[in-house]
A protein has these predicted regions:
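Secondary-structure "cap/kink" motif recognition
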Residues: 1-184
Length: 184
């Protein structure tokens, strides 16, 4: 009976040791942004010296300074459903000297800034491409030194070209010459 009790105690101890080791490998994730899209009035995307601003005018979204393109709503939906919900997972560095390695410094990274209705900053982050995992990327909040791996790659959803965000409006319908002439 004592041997059976000893074996049971050993199994319980091994179970708890195994659980504690597995917890070290568990990745905790949290939101990069804690912003709701209905609070966003404008967002800016900047890569190198190229930037684009997308702003809300009443209930519609427009590319700032570009009145020839109509915004593609699927791009705005991507911002709401993918960018604002991206998760940061494991921290890969807290050393600012390694920002270039992870492409999250000001010159290599892609910066997105969200603004509210009174032009206050709601959130600002720099995303960098991962050279080893194409389906994920790195992120650093602008005022922080920690660099995190994200749960998915959002860089392909953030572009600075106006034609990525908008498309030319369809041409007006042609009026046939016979339609404009009426005989009485």
């Amino acid at each position: 009976m004592k041997i059976l009790l000893g074996v049971l105690l050993l199994i319980i101890i091994l179970f708890f040791v195994s659980q504690s080791r597995q917890k070290r490998h568990f990745t905790q994730s949290s939101d990069v942004f804690t912003i709701s899209m209905d609070k966003v009035n404008r967002f800016d995307i900047q890569k190198d010296s190229i930037s684009i601003s997308i702003e809300r005018i009443d209930t519609t979204w427009q590319i700032a300074g570009n009145d020839s393109l109509l915004i593609q709503m699927n791009r705005i939906n991507d911002v709401e459903q993918k960018i604002l919900t991206v998760q940061r997972e494991s921290m890969v560095s807290n050393n600012s000297k390694k920002w270039k390695t992870f492409n999250v410094d000001d010159s290599l990274g892609l910066k997105i800034t969200f603004y509210g209705y009174t032009n206050e900053k709601l959130g600002e982050a720099i995303f960098g491409r991962s050279s080893s995992e194409w389906q994920r990327c790195y992120v650093r909040m602008v005022d922080e030194s920690e660099v995190y791996m994200t749960n998915e790659n959002v860089l392909n959803r953030l572009q600075t070209q106006p034609t990525f965000w908008g498309s030319k409006p369809p041409p007006p319908p042609k009026i046939e010459a016979s339609d404009s002439l009426q005989t009485f």
